[in-house]
From Swiss-Prot:
Bilayer-spanning residue ranges: 21-43
Family under the similarity heading: Belongs to the cytochrome P450 family.
UniProt-listed SUPFAM superfamilies: Cytochrome P450
Keywords: Heme, Iron, Membrane, Metal-binding, Monooxygenase, Oxidoreductase, Transmembrane, Transmembrane helix
Protein name per the record: Cytochrome P450 monooxygenase olcJ
Entry's localization field: Membrane
EC code(s) of this entry: 1.-.-.-
Membrane topology: Single-pass membrane protein
Organism: Penicillium canescens
Length: 527
């Protein structure tokens, strides 16, 4: 039986007994206390029975309870992981999150694990566990691979034809979201500006016009992620068996469900109308070219239900908006910190545009220096310290004889500082463009390329299916911002510190940047 189910049943039973006069309030409190304690011990026993025996890092005293170690990991995840990588160089160790133990394995195992089927080690189960799918509502992704299939077979192959659409929406978004800076430098929240640019572009590609300019949809797609992550940030600090008890007490939990209802109210009628329009056979019918339409086209009758498609659209917004926003924000911070890169990048953008005469996929592909700059920015400011997270579904024996028991949550260090090699902490924006000049390595060092040493998008069959769209979107946004604006930090400030929440790294969203429209703006050359 599932301890989570036990807790709900026992609490309901206690309430019924109280209503019948069988328990006083004191006895109810005692019954609940005993239940919680018993469930904790059961949960701990089950976890221990399934656990891979490995040293646990982050413990300060031998008698220290694990929940305290897990609580510290939520704030000092980088320190715990660095301790483990230093003490057990190229070895295996554990870190404690309060909702689970994570077994950290060296990246040398990636090549033999990435091809194993989902029935052996599951990426989707790890995503559900990390993002608390039951409480964030992303568990709909377990119902099928519709989103992955459409991203891989429809979005990525059509990126070339979508470039003019993306550029058009970006231009519109910049006029809507960036305040007028013609006269002087303006102090702005650059993260917030980028967030709304990304949300608008993503909406144009995902749901098309006119919905992409529906302010309620844009707000919902942004807030959903914020509400979901606030919910999981709180629940992750608690043992798993407490999640069904605490979640309904959180305002953010209910906000997630309100966001979902809003998404269904906006998107479901569009799905029904599109289906009816296509079925009508009208001569003037023109099928939309966006992710929603591709989902309608290939979905099974079950997956194609309007409410389910609306739900998937909202979850895809969660995946697309904030990680892309962070990548662009970090790159802008690095341009402020290292302004010597600005002019070489502008020259590359200008040269690429002159060769193609317009914004095209090939235009962005030519920008090796910009691609390198973004990759270097990500190297020093990764979105997560861990990647390649999997749940072992049946015991797996590695090539060196290491046996991973069923139920083990495994991961690999993604941040280069954790990968057991000499770490260069200096910023070298063109590091990867130089490496791409070597024979046979033109593709190896691209921003969207994955391998055992570059895991920010995952690796293998379950690498991020939208990473190519993200890479082109990031380059498109940075190119336009660079050509039209100058940036610098306000006097007395510098690149903001990064916050740690478990293994996730987050920029300070309150960071201010001075922004000024260039008098010699290349706006006219950007078409």
């Amino acid at each position: 039986m599932d301890p989570n189910t036990w807790s709900a049943d026992l609490f309901q039973l206690a309430s019924q007994w109280q209503e019948k006069g069988l328990l006083t309030r004191y006895n109810v409190f005692m019954a609940i206390s005993i239940t919680v304690t018993a469930l904790y011990l059961i949960h701990k026993g089950i976890s221990r029975a399934r656990s891979f025996r490995a040293p646990l890092v982050g413990r300060r005293f031998s008698w220290e309870p694990k929940w305290l170690i897990g609580l510290r990991f939520s704030q000092y995840g980088l320190e715990h992981l660095m301790e483990g990588c230093k003490r057990f160089n190229d070895g295996i160790f554990k870190v404690a999150r309060n909702d689970t133990d994570i077994l950290v394995i060296p990246n040398r195992y990636v090549d033999e694990l990435h091809s194993k089927p989902e029935e052996h080690i599951s990426a989707i189960k790890a995503h559900m566990k990390n993002l608390l799918g039951k409480y964030s509502t992303i568990d709909i992704l377990q119902e099928g691979n519709l989103h992955t299939h459409v991203l891989q077979t429809k979005l990525t192959p059509n990126l070339g034809s979508l470039m003019s659409t993306i550029e058009e929406e970006l231009r519109f978004a910049m006029t809507e979201e960036i305040p007028s800076t013609h006269e002087d430098w303006k102090d702005v929240s650059i993260y917030d500006i980028i967030l709304h640019l990304v949300a608008r572009i993503s909406a144009r590609v995902f749901v098309g016009q006119p919905t992409c300019r529906n302010q309620e949809w844009l707000d919902t797609s942004i807030r959903f992620t914020e509400h979901a992550f606030l919910t999981l940030a709180i629940l992750r600090r608690l043992p798993k068996f407490l999640h069904p008890i605490v979640a309904p007490l959180l305002p953010s939990y209910w906000a997630v469900h309100r966001d979902l209802q809003t998404a269904k109210r906006i998107i479901s009628p569009i799905v029904k109308q599109r289906t009816a329009d296509e079925a009508s056979g009208e001569p003037g019918y023109k099928k939309p070219t966006d992710l929603l339409q591709w989902m309608i086209d290939v979905a099974s009758p079950r997956d194609g239900q309007p409410d389910k498609l609306a739900h998937r659209q909202l979850v895809l917004s969660l995946a697309a908006i904030h990680t892309t926003t962070m990548a662009v924000a970090y790159a802008i911070y690095d341009l402020c910190q290292f302004p010597e890169y600005v002019e070489p990048l502008r020259q590359e953008i200008t040269d690429s545009l002159e060769q193609d005469g317009k914004w095209a996929k090939t235009t962005l592909t030519k920008m090796h220096k910009l691609d390198s700059f973004i990759k270097e920015s990500q190297r020093l400011s990764p979105p997560s310290l861990l990647s390649f997270q999997r749940i072992v579904m049946q015991e797996v024996t590695l090539s060196d004889g290491t046996a991973l028991p069923k139920g083990t949550h495994i991961s690999v260090p993604a941040a280069e500082v954790l990968q057991g090699k000499a770490f260069d902490s200096s910023f070298d924006g063109f590091r990867y463009s130089r490496r791409r000049q070597n024979s046979g390595e033109a593709h190896k060092y691209q921003f969207a390329t994955t391998d055992k040493n570059s895991l920010h998008f995952g690796h293998g069959k379950y690498a991020c299916p939208g990473r190519f769209f993200a890479a082109y979107e990031i380059k498109m946004i940075i190119s336009h911002l660079l050509m039209d604006y100058d940036f610098r930090f306000p006097p007395g400030t510098s690149r903001p510190k990064v916050f740690s929440a478990d293994e996730v790294l987050l920029p300070d969203p309150s960071t201010r940047v001075l922004m000024h429209r260039r008098t010699d703006s290349a706006h006219s050359n950007c078409h």
